[in-house]
Curated annotation (Swiss-Prot):
Disulfide bonds: 151-177
Gene encoding the protein: TNFSF8
Organism, as annotated: Homo sapiens
This protein's record includes keyword Nucleotide-binding: no
Protein name: Tumor necrosis factor ligand superfamily member 8
Pfam families (alphabetical): TNF
Length: 234
């Protein structure tokens, strides 16, 4: 081949090092950004599903009634984002015979969660971390918890359990801080729903394995337990 042509072709070809070398820091930064974006999208989706599910139940309740009585305006609690939407839905719902809306206690020291006693309790009794049913019927139960994990050197399992009479009926489980992740802080939302027929004196409680990770500072109003009587024999 002509030496001049060979030299021109060599000048057009990109250097092998330039084409293949990508700084390790750039890759780690890109992965960290992708992980955070995925987490925020997942949290927003869960919150939207929570509101949508409760709203759907409310529509079904409204369709079963002839009129909706005026709701009280003196409810002392005010939530933020998802919990605020949930509380607003409950305040405007036609059922008033039996319902409750409680926020998690500020200081937790055991796996069975305790709740603020100054929440809304109507036709339901609260005792030692339990909601105690006073009227039999079909109840809708919802619990939402926000976790903040300072990642240790190992993965962490976050679990939320809904218990009826001390027996686990529903649970949600997620593993965070897995090996290879670049982030040091993880925000994780867990929620669970249950529709079940409950008798008088039935107890409802919530357990978590890692109560120390429940975020009562950044999102104190996002940790709620709520129930309402959807249908009874009356």
């Amino acid at each position: 081949m002509d030496p001049g042509l060979q030299q021109a072709l060599n000048g057009m070809a990109p250097p092998g090092d330039t084409a293949m070398h990508v700084p390790a820091g750039s890759v780690a930064s890109h992965l960290g950004t992708t992980s955070r974006s995925y987490f925020y999208l997942t949290t927003a989706t869960l919150a939207l599903c929570l509101v949508f599910t409760v709203a759907t139940i409310m529509v079904l309740v409204v369709q079963r009634t002839d009129s909706i009585p005026n709701s009280p305006d003196n409810v002392p609690l005010k939530g933020g984002n998802c919990s605020e939407d949930l509380l607003c839905i409950l305040k405007r719902a036609p059922f008033k015979k039996s319902w409750a809306y409680l926020q998690v206690a500020k200081h937790l020291n055991k796996t069975k969660l305790s709740w603020n006693k100054d929440g809304i309790l109507h036709g339901v009794r609260y005792q030692d971390g339990n909601l105690v049913i006073q009227f039999p019927g079909l109840y809708f139960i919802i619990c939402q918890l926000q976790f903040l994990v300072q990642c240790p050197n190992n993965s962490v399992d976050l679990k939320l359990e809904l218990l009826i009479n001390k027996h686990i009926k529903k649970q949600a489980l997620v593993t965070v801080c897995e090996s290879g992740m670049q982030t040091k802080h993880v925000y994780q939302n867990l929620s669970q729903f249950l529709l079940d027929y409950l008798q008088v004196n039935t107890t409802i409680s919530v357990n978590v394995d890692t109560f120390q990770y429940i975020d009562t500072s950044t999102f104190p109003l996002e940790n709620v337990l709520s129930i309402f009587l959807y249908s009874n024999s009356d």
